Amino acid sequence: MTDAQIALLPDRGVVQVSGEDARKLLDSIITNDLSLLDKQDAIFAGLLSPQGKILFDFFVVRDGDGFLLDVARDQAAGLVKRLSLYKLRAKVAIAEAVGAQVEASWPTAAGSVADPRHGELGGRRISQSPVAFDPGAFEAYHAHRIALGVPEGGKDYAFGDVFPHEALFDQLSGVSFTKGCYVGQEIVARMEHRGTARKRIVRVTADGALPVMGTDVLAGEVVIGAMGSSAGVRGLAMLRLDRMVEFAGKGVGLTCGGVRMVPDAGDVARLAPKTAG
């Protein structure tokens, strides 16, 4: 068996949600179904605005009578505040888990839970005594994630700007289409049933090193998307796939920061909206 690579993820924090009403509260507001934790160790989910856009994305694991949420560290305090707004009189305690750290491993290391977003991504572990930070391992983890086409909030899209389908929640087991209502559910359900998500995050390969997140992606002189994270010549970009298909039919390629790039054909074929030619 291949030894697992393990990387401390210092950009991740942990929020603890506990108490007898913890499950009821979370299940009423997040995109995924907590009952999945009856048969798997972790779920991926988001908390949306009433307009259906992603405010936070996180992993959820059981913790006694409550749950731990593995979230971007710079979003942890905001998540605590947002969850507290929905708490009202529910018997729930919400706080950052002081000292908790998150590790990623690939393949999944002993003591870790499988990352629910992709079968080849590996595992995650919340720990009070994690491995030491290794910049090389951290970069290797994100290169692995990018190669598999798995986006991450704050690195591939800005929180508050995109819908779950645009960030591939429907592809990464991040949203339930069978559970009851949650915040933003009507918009997400409508987009799913109509198949009209025009913007999607896809893998791209470039002629040279790719520019930073947010750099415009151009088809000729027309902006059709924005760059996300990258590792060398490979990266993730959010593209208007209907426009990209249109321009590709005219022989117009893509550039980003002056660098030529090619989107992954399999991603485009799988994710292009039903209305695209």
Question: Where do the PLM segments sit?
Answer:
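Acidic, low-complexity central loop/insert segments
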Residues: D3-L9, G13-Q16, F56-P151
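Short, conserved charged micro-motifs
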Residues: D21-L26, A76-V80, S129-D134, L210-T215, ...
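Acidic, proline/glycine-enriched N-terminal capping motif
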Residues: M1-L55, G64
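A common structural junction motif
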Residues: D33-L34, L83-K91, F133-Y141, A219-I224, ...
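Glycine-rich, small/acidic residue-mixed loop/short-helix segments
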Residues: A167-S173, A189-G277
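Short amphipathic beta-strand starts and helix->beta connectors
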Residues: M1-T2, I43-D57, T108-S112, V188, ...
